[in-house]
Amino acid sequence: MSKLFWAMLSFITRLPVPRRWSQGLDFEHYSRGIITFPLIGLLLGAISGLVFMVLQAWCGAPLAALFSVLVLVLMTGGFHLDGLADTCDGVFSARSRDRMLEIMRDSRLGTHGGLALIFVVLAKILVLSELALRGESILASLAAACAVSRGTAALLMYRHRYAREEGLGNVFIGKIDGRQTCVTLGLAAIFAAVLLPGMHGVAAMVVTMVAIFILGQLLKRTLGGQTGDTLGAAIELGELVFLLALL
């Protein structure tokens, strides 16, 4: 289990992980690491939340929110934001399915992708600032949001097919079973309930699950399946939906 955690941490983040900690784990077995996604999200959100706490007293909530979001982006290498941008460029191009998938592979940023990035990043900053003004714990909110968003991404993997012939997303999409999905969602729910007591966190997770499930069905209808880019988009949108549900 520890090897899986470290392998997943190095796979979906840019945090330094000694190679020997994940040595001996075959790439084909990475799908089992889905159950570590909520824990990795918890770690990322906690670090980002700590940055907010340290900076809030010095520069106020808006700037603290800006830097906490920036730290979160740096820790993931913009991996998920890139997926969000590519997904929006492809889906909103209104082309054929094959052409959409080609556009999503294009490394150039299009108008729809750029607008999506601006909207999501600004929305996160504004929501975090508002939550802070309402006296909510940003550390707990971010930790729960990142855990839940990565946990609910399993909804785009279970019983979905990969829309391309090959790619990184193929490691997970269609490769996880019902038990792994339930364990992943269960861990995310536990983190949300512990960090945000009074059913506030669980209610926000339910809203997030519904939103991500609907997103998955829409993408399945549009693209014929899921890709690594759509998983990244689901994680970014899941974070935002969860935070919005806390308002």
Curated annotation (Swiss-Prot):
Keyword Flavoprotein: no
Transmembrane segments: 34-54, 59-79, 113-133, 138-158, 194-214
Chemical reaction(s) catalysed: alpha-ribazole + adenosylcob(III)inamide-GDP = adenosylcob(III)alamin + GMP + H(+); alpha-ribazole 5'-phosphate + adenosylcob(III)inamide-GDP = adenosylcob(III)alamin 5'-phosphate + GMP + H(+)
GO terms under cellular component: plasma membrane
A GO molecular-function descriptor: adenosylcobinamide-GDP ribazoletransferase activity
GO terms, biological process: cobalamin biosynthetic process
Main location: membrane
Coiled coil: none
Upregulation: By cobinamide.
CC cofactor: Mg(2+)
Keyword 4Fe-4S attached: no
Pfam families, A to Z: CobS (PF02654)
Membrane topology field: Multi-pass membrane protein
Keywords: Cell inner membrane, Cell membrane, Cobalamin biosynthesis, Magnesium, Membrane, Transferase, Transmembrane, Transmembrane helix
Pathway: Cofactor biosynthesis; adenosylcobalamin biosynthesis; adenosylcobalamin from cob(II)yrinate a,c-diamide: step 7/7
Location(s) in or outside the cell: Cell inner membrane
Assigned EC number: 2.7.8.26
EC class: transferase
NCBIfam families for this protein: cobS
Function: Joins adenosylcobinamide-GDP and alpha-ribazole to generate adenosylcobalamin (Ado-cobalamin). Also synthesizes adenosylcobalamin 5'-phosphate from adenosylcobinamide-GDP and alpha-ribazole 5'-phosphate.
Family to which the UniProt record says this protein belongs: Belongs to the CobS family.
Protein name listed in UniProt: Adenosylcobinamide-GDP ribazoletransferase
